[in-house]
Curated annotation (Swiss-Prot):
It catalyses: a 1,2-diacyl-sn-glycerol + H2O = a 2-acylglycerol + a fatty acid + H(+); 1-octadecanoyl-2-(5Z,8Z,11Z,14Z-eicosatetraenoyl)-sn-glycerol + H2O = 2-(5Z,8Z,11Z,14Z-eicosatetraenoyl)-glycerol + octadecanoate + H(+); 1,2-di-(9Z-octadecenoyl)-sn-glycerol + H2O = 2-(9Z-octadecenoyl)-glycerol + (9Z)-octadecenoate + H(+); 1-(9Z-octadecenoyl)-2-(5Z,8Z,11Z,14Z-eicosatetraenoyl)-sn-glycerol + H2O = 2-(5Z,8Z,11Z,14Z-eicosatetraenoyl)-glycerol + (9Z)-octadecenoate + H(+). This is Diacylglycerol lipase-alpha. Pfam families: Lipase_3. Inhibited by 1,2,3-triazole urea covalent inhibitors KT172, DH376 and DO34. Inhibited by p-hydroxy-mercuri-benzoate and HgCl(2), but not to PMSF. Also inhibited by RHC80267. Diacylglycerol lipase activity is inhibited by the phosphorylation of Ser-784 and Ser-810 by CAMK2A. The gene is Dagla. It is a multi-pass membrane protein. It is found in: Cell membrane; Cell projection, Dendritic spine membrane; Postsynaptic density membrane; Early endosome membrane. GO terms for cellular component: cytoplasm; dendrite membrane; dendritic spine membrane; early endosome membrane; plasma membrane; postsynaptic density membrane; postsynaptic membrane; varicosity. Residues 848-905, 1013-1044 are annotated as: Disordered. CDD domains: Lipase_3. Phosphorylated at Ser-784 and Ser-810 by CAMK2A; phosphorylation by CAMK2A inhibits diacylglycerol lipase activity. Its cofactor is Ca(2+). It comes from Rattus norvegicus (Rat). Its EC number is 3.1.1.116.
Length: 1044
């Protein structure tokens, strides 16, 4: 809330900040009230002892003071818990209660003095031990409370409080010259106050001219940032809590919408179909990423002994102590003669820590040439090393580690880069521009780079490349230093880890992409803050505070894990409804524009390491580790501060190092994005979730031939997609899905004796129940995607009712041929509308299985009636019975799909109807999809005289059928991107429901034994054809549905 006004002065504390202090004092005074009451009325005192009589009189008076304090503190607690952050009207009487409490405090002060007098007179002579101890406790407690109140008053004292009250009173009446003068005095007073605070914060440092200038610039920056804002520090804390809740609510609302391209949020960043992932399967991309991880070790070593001990708190101290000689053995050589160390401590701990860091990482080929530990404002420590393994000279700049570094960070005005020969104006962060100029000057004066490149001419150091690295402040300084050194070293490369957001202007940022690679981890705060970003953050903070109607204590307490979360203020709350109660600010104060600052952005090409957030487990269950992914970030996308408990933790250098390594670990474990998404997302499609289908090529087993319908023998006709699916197994791990396996002859024969549709229904129903039990919370996970992989169906736009169960059983479609090898396909969850998708697939399976069973025995019945070598006797007998029934003119039972003169009947089988109802009961929650009978009529011609191969006649039926293929739920959606629309470098290929070849073309998955008309009924049953298998044109393919 606005600062409370007491004694006609504004204080840096709000009336709703007094809840906890009042509760603490109330409990303390209640405890002493009980103790003193027991001592006074429960004990018998000697009437002849003067000390006892004085104690009784003093105690009774103090009981009255304690009772008054308890009443006043209860009133303070009650008033502080009323109203909202900016709704101060219910707390208007707080100042009068404080006047009463301060008057009681004065009386307490008098009684504390009396207690000291009593102790000096009677403490040694009084024989009543209880009286002496109680009096001593009361006096000590009183003085502790009094001193605490005095310290608190000094902390919340605002030097500009009187001017602020006058300015507010003047603005209420009119705007005139007096208002301008008061505002000017207020800004100057606030700048002076901030400067004094900075000097107190850096009281142990020696002040130089540059440091004094930094004090002034930062003080004016803070004064301007907080000008006209009548808020207190606790309001900022509550605002951060509310802002985090609002950001999370907005992300959930975006995911629930159906008319946007955002698929998920990873580390607060939106993931769309255009998101570019690092293609780690590409050798060049993998080499580049490993190079980024490698040089992070150099940036980490620049922090010296503090970071070394932080990473290795146990054995690190022993390692340093063994190498340090300190001042006891100055003659002991610790470094090579060619190593220059500047301003290290007496033990040389920083230089030793840098060397130990490389030794611990087995980087023995790294030689330290120069180490500067000099630390001042605009003068950042750095070191230069020669890496003989990589044939590079490395300049590593330290990040923020001292208060002086913080001053350099806070000097964030735009400064012109001292680089000539370019078009436009290149601007950079002032503090880091000055630091880069200092390092460049130091390198030239000490001829450090000449020493490095001439370190070992026999090993070719003269032709080594130059690398500049840094983290945080060092990252920004390294990027700007690269601008300064690039004219002399055109092949220079820079790696900036967690660089500041307000670093380079747009022109300079675009140019830096040629030689700078930046790394950002998760929700790191630093790459998202600059002057322009802070202005937006300021507006968001004020807006969320203005909309809040909850008490501050409830908001802050609700942010803890042990207390239920506070309610998020609704956006529909009319701000004007409380305008009369918010007289603390002028109407234009919330919309004032800060001084126009040039937008600055992070440098180079940004690798954004993001990760998912697994659902929190109970205390007895093991927490699932998050999965890390690397994507290419947009420099202009880091324009909003994402409030999170991890926003500071993910900026630490060793945490960044761990994040980079976890991307490689997840990739090596095969945790790819699409398959992880298949486990947790709510509406994946069949092909998009399995871009790399597993093909297991196994020889035919010795023994009886497999029955019809249990194995898939793909024809040898060469297709255009055969080159990408010829591997025995994909590089991707299909975790969460059972692998395709070859049935044994015995199991195959037993399965063949059952009705294929019944086998399908039983197996699929059991598999579906197990799959629904294993479903996890819907949270997007994704990793490295290549050009051939698709994320189209990775759709996070879901409603709350579909977050637990959406998907349908995997139907295993196989074809059988006579010769060749066997390939098994393990499909995944079908398309977005599970009820419709599975019923269409089931219908096609049922229709074609009956069709294949009834049409194939015709040749055998017309021939000799013998059993062909390719078919088992049982299958031949079934075919004979079917053929005989057909010849005899028998009528098929009602509910079966029988073949009459080459035409299908118009009603599905009972098994199909039963399973369709089961699917509807699970998935058809919204009742928007077509009914099963409608689908059946759409797949099977209504007229008994029409030929089966003709398909739908009217254009409307054709349109419905096509939309049933591509849009299963028949609901209009935004235009979809297909295979050719994604950029090759994006790492994601998009398709409606088809897999892609390595060239980005749609793969032809039509079985060669079926006609184009028959494929209309089998559009959901997709297979792919490897190279080298041909089809016999004279034989009819058998299509049987098999479920595992």
């Amino acid at each position: 809330m606005p600062g409370i006004v007491v004694f006609r002065r504004r204080w840096s504390v709000g009336s709703d900040d007094l809840v906890l202090p009042a509760i603490f004092l109330f409990l303390l005074h209640t405890t002493w009230f009980v103790i003193l009451s027991v001592v006074l009325f429960g004990l018998v005192y000697n009437p002849h002892e003067a000390c006892s009589l004085n104690l009784v009189d003093h105690g009774r008076g103090y009981l009255g003071i304690l009772l008054s304090c308890m009443i006043a503190e209860m009133a303070i607690i009650w008033l502080s818990m009323r109203g909202g952050i900016l709704y101060t009207e219910p707390r208007d009487s707080m100042q009068y209660v404080l006047y009463v409490r301060l008057a009681i405090l004065v009386i307490e002060f008098i009684y504390a003095i009396v207690g000291i007098v009593w102790l000096t007179q009677y403490y040694t002579s009084c024989n009543d031990l209880t009286a002496k101890n109680v009096t001593l406790g009361m006096v000590v407690c009183n003085w502790v409370v009094i001193l605490s109140v005095c310290i608190t008053v000094l902390c919340v004292f605002d030097p500009t409080g009187r001017t602020f009250v006058k300015l507010r009173a003047t603005k209420r009446r009119q705007r005139n010259l007096r208002t301008y003068n008061l505002r000017h005095r207020l800004e100057e007073g606030q700048a002076t106050s901030w400067s004094r605070r900075l000097k107190v914060f850096l009281c142990c440092t020696r002040t130089k001219d540059s440091q004094s200038d930094a004090y002034s610039e930062i003080a004016y920056l803070f004064a301007e940032f907080f000008r006209d804002l009548d808020i207190v520090p606790s309001d900022i804390i509550a605002g951060l809590v509310l802002l985090r809740q609002r950001q999370r609510a907005k992300r959930n609302a975006v995911l629930d919408e159906a008319n946007n391209d955002i698929l998920a949020f990873l580390s607060g960043m939106p993931v769309t179909r255009n998101t570019k992932y690092l293609d780690l399967k590409n050798s060049h991309e993998m080499l580049r990423y490993k190079e980024v991880c490698y040089y992070m070790l150099f940036a980490l070593a620049a922090y010296g002994w503090p970071m070394y001990l932080m990473r290795k708190p146990t054995c690190g101290l022993c390692q340093l102590a063994r190498s340090c000689s300190c001042c006891l053995c100055p003659a002991r050589p610790r470094f090579a003669p060619g190593v220059t160390i500047e301003e290290d401590n007496c033990c040389g701990c920083n230089a030793i820590a840098i060397r130990r860091h490389f030794l611990d990482e087995n980087m023995t080929a790294v030689d330290i040439v120069y180490t500067s530990c000099h630390d001042a404002v605009y003068e950042t420590p750095f070191y230069v090393a020669v890496d003989h393994d990589k044939k590079k000279v490395v300049i590593s700049i330290r990040g923020t580690l001292s208060p002086k570094d913080a001053l350099t960070d806070l000097t964030g005005d735009a400064e012109r880069l001292p680089v000539e020969g370019h078009r436009g104006t290149w601007l950079g962060h002032k503090g880091m521009v000055l630091s880069a100029e200092y390092i460049k000057k130091k390198l030239e004066q000490e001829m450090v780079l000449s020493q490095a490149f001439g370190r070992d001419l026999g090993r070719g150091t003269k032709h080594y490349g130059l690398i500049v690295v840094g983290h945080s402040l060092g990252a920004g300084t390294a990027a700007i230093l690269s601008f300064l050194l690039r004219p002399q070293y055109p092949t220079l490369k820079c790696f900036a880890y967690s660089p500041p957001g307000g670093l380079l202007s747009e022109d300079a940022m675009e140019y830096s992409k040629e030689f700078v690679t930046a790394v950002v981890l998760g929700k790191d705060l630093v790459p998202r803050i600059g002057l322009s970003q802070l202005e937006g953050f300021r507006r968001q903070l004020l807006d969320v505070l203005q909309r809040s109607t909850k008490p501050k204590w409830r908001i802050i307490v609700g942010a803890t894990k042990c207390i239920p979360k506070s309610e998020l203020p609704e956006d529909q709350v009319e701000v004007t409804a409380l305008a009369s109660t918010r007289l603390w600010t002028h109407p234009s104060d919330l919309t004032i524009a800060l001084s126009a600052s040039t937008p600055l952005y992070p440098p180079g090409r940004i690798i954004h390491v993001v990760h998912n957030h697994p659902a929190e487990q109970c205390c007895c269950c093991e927490q699932e580790e998050p999965t890390y992914f690397a994507i290419w970030g947009d420099n202009k996308a880091f324009n909003e501060v994402i409030i999170s408990p991890a926003m500071l933790h993910e900026h630490l250098p060793y945490v960044v190092m761990e994040g980079l390594n976890k991307v490689l670990e997840n990739y090596n474990k095969g945790k790819t994005a699409l398959l992880s998404a298949a486990k947790v997302m709510v509406s994946p499609t069949e092909v998009d979730l399995t871009p790399e289908l597993i093909f297991q090529q196994q020889p035919l087993p010795t023994g009886p031939p497999l029955p019809t319908g249990l194995a898939l023998e793909l024809p040898a006709t060469e297709h255009r997609n055969s080159s990408v699916r010829s591997k025995s197994q994909s590089e991707m791990s299909l975790e969460g899905f059972s692998e395709g396996r070859l049935l044994s002859p015995v199991a195959a024969a037993s399965a063949a004796r059952q009705d294929p549709v019944e086998l399908l229904l039983l197996s699929t129903q059991e598999r579906l129940a197990a799959e629904l039990q294993s479903r996890r919370a819907p949270l997007a996970t994704m990793e490295s995607l290549s050009d051939t992989e698709s994320l189209y169906s990775f759709d996070s736009r879901r409603s709350s009712g579909f977050r637990s169960i959406r998907g349908s059983p995997s139907l295993h479609a196989v074809l059988e041929r006579d010769e060749g090898h066997l390939f098994y396909i393990d499909p995944a969850i079908p398309e977005e509308n599970p009820s419709l998708s599975s019923r269409t697939e089931l219908l096609a399976a049922d229709s074609l299985s009956k069709h294949s069973q009834d049409t194939q025995p015709l040749e055998a019945a017309l021939g000799s009636g013998g059993v062909t070598p390719e078919r088992p006797p049982s299958a031949a007998n079934d075919e004979e019975e079917a053929a005989g029934g057909s010849e005899g003119g028998g009528v098929a039972p009602r509910g079966e799909l029988a073949l009459h003169n080459g035409r299908l009947g118009d009603s599905p089988s009972p098994q199909v109807l039963e399973f369709a109802e089961f699917i509807d009961s699970l998935f058809n929650l919204d009742s928007k999809s077509s009914s099963f009978q409608d689908l059946y009529c759409m797949m099977v011609p209504e007229s008994p005289t029409s030929d089966y191969t003709e398909g739908p006649k009217s254009p409307s039926q054709q349109e419905i059928l096509l939309r049933a293929q591509f849009e299963p739920n028949l609901v209009p959606k935004p235009p979809r991107l297909f295979a050719g629309s994604a950029e090759p470098s994006s790492g994601i290929s998009l398709s409606p429901s088809f897999p892609l070849s390595s060239s980005g073309e749609l793969m032809d998955l039509t079985p060669t034994g079926l006609s184009s008309q028959e494929c209309l009924a089998t559009d959901k049953i997709r297979t792919s054809t490897p190279t080298g298998h041909g089809a016999s044109p004279t034989k009819q393919d058998d299509l049987v549905i098999s479920a595992r």
